[in-house]
Amino acid sequence: MHQSGSRTLSKEELALLRLFAFKVKHNLTEAAFNDLLIAFPGNDISSWQVTSRHIQCLSGFKPVRYDCCPDSCVCYTGPYEKYDACPVCGKARYKPNSTQLRSYFAYLPIIPRLCAMVANSRLAKEMHYRSQYEDESQEGIMEDIFDGDLYKSLLNKLIMVVGKNLPFHHFSDHRDIALGVSMDGVSVFKKRSKTCSPLLLFNYNLPPDTRFHMNNIIPAGIIPGPKKPVDMDSFLHPLVQELVQLEIGVTAFDGLSKTVFLLRAHLLVVIGDIPAVTLLMRMKGHNGFSPCHMCKIVGVKASLSNTYYVPLHHRNVSGSSSGPYDPSNLPMCMHNGFIDEANQVQFARTLTLEQNLATEFGIKGIPLLSSLGSLSFPASFPYDFMHLVWENLILNLVLFWTGCFKELRHEGMGYSLDDSVWTDICCISAEASDTIPAAFGCHVPDMSTQRWQLTAESWEVWTLYIAPIMLYGRFTEEKYYKHFRRLVHLLKLCLEYELLMEKVAKIENSFIRWVEDYERSVIKVMTLNGVLTCSNAFRFYYQHNISRLLACPLTIHALLHVGSSIRANGLVWTNWAFPMERYCGDVVRHVRNRHYLYIGINNYATSSAQLAQLKLRYDLDEELSFGSQDNDAGHIYDGCK
């Protein structure tokens, strides 16, 4: 017997759910689903149209459609609700001589799904992890996001909604839910001509070993392309409305105590790559005059370029009024200062003043997410470790070593590798990857011929387990190998499952030294004869040379904020984008119809979310998975016990 509250499923409804789960799991088209009526006559199979209506009723939620620009510039919510054309590109909202919309964003409400989670007795018990962790956590040891300073500060902070304090603190009830939100852009095709942007929520009340499983991730919708949004807040509007409701509290049923209570949820962290965080915080971006969203370091524009670079050492850089920055004492952005500057831009009296202030502050206006009292700007928006390190830092180092990093001179540099040497490294790395157990990560392809197959995970496997061996003795100057080995040691430290606070301080200081060495130039040394001379032994990539300014992108500077982000938000694996990458890969694999691309993507996101909801509401997790549950335990061989 399967039931939700007083609602009991009939045999016919259960058969309908199995059929629906079969369609979602095997990515059947609507035409293929309808053909089942012909292939299996007499089995009382309904058409897809009838089935989808039943599924909406049984799951307890359906997508809410919001009109949006056909280029996804804006979504017609909030201030744009009554617009008939896009305020950015001018394209019409509706088709000619019709009230039929041209494009839409299918938002998936999160409140019904959070209520289903706490109503499911099995999951509700797992969600006690957060409150139990508070009681059992050890002082001075960091093991989860709840050891971060931001979460701890919320425990003694009254909930504020629309400028008014409510008479209770954040997480005052053991059932209050800690949430994280993640956004990323994904290219649907290899040519990267069309993109879409999934919005996901993570339930941090679940234990770390299950919280990022696909069936526990909460999709809030997929923003259609073909371009990235210009006004991200217009797409966030329905989500923020629900998050404000959840701060106040919504009525829910406790599956353990069998009582009705007021469910609250609070957003702890926002996860995304640099472009995504730029949109979510309404900042100018990584090419702005002040490109870092964590501190106020001033960028330096390279000649014949509109891009600003951020070396610590600004001396001898034309047009720069800043001296060398102290990496241990950077001019950090604080919440009150950020909001004050955003207000100045938002309410500037003239357009010219608004543009000047936006350029000076690097902020375009007040972000909609600032209406949530649980977020701190910019501390709640850490640099994503996955994108920062595996998809940018390591790739850039490889481009240096192969002489392909931008328009810099690489000939004669001690880090430069001959083509034959690099080809040999790539070939042996791919062969070595065949012998690495899959538990360590995915296969590493031949990077010289199959670089397009490289993912963040394969970069990680190569960096941590293969590169330290493959690169030994390859550089003409050994200092570059030692510099890389120091980085690998640091990355392994960041990936530990628990950290003493002393190690967090070590991470901060070690990244400071690594970045300083990355920028370092020749230094003057005293010879035995008492004569000052210049030594090249300490010259690395930037070399304090204006002609090499391109060697200092934001992704190098961002390493200086990894340690402080761990202090604020917990260990890097608690808020990185790997779960988002897995979801994006799942979306791309389910693309079937190129003509109705975004309709198909929305339909898949909706169907998979409804299937997860049905499993929760009627306790059908095993039955609707057809026995193919995730098994992370693996097999333990007798000789390894």
Predicted regions mapped to residue ranges:
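N-terminal alpha-helical interaction blocks
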Residues: 1-66, 75-77
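Residues immediately within or flanking Cys/His clusters that coordinate Zn2+
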Residues: 63-66, 70-72, 83, 289
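Short, cysteine/histidine-rich loop/knuckle motifs that typically chelate Zn2+
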Residues: 68-71, 88, 294
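Cys/His-rich microdomains that often coordinate metals
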Residues: 73-77, 93, 296-299, 584
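Domain-level detector for long, ordered catalytic/regulatory cores in large eukaryotic signaling
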Residues: 82, 91-156, 236, 244-456, ...
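Acidic, metal-ligating active-site segments
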Residues: 156-157, 161, 165-166, 171-225, ...
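Compact, glycine/acidic-enriched structural inserts
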Residues: 204-251, 303, 495, 619
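Terminal interaction-prone segments of large eukaryotic proteins
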Residues: 296-297, 395, 403-641
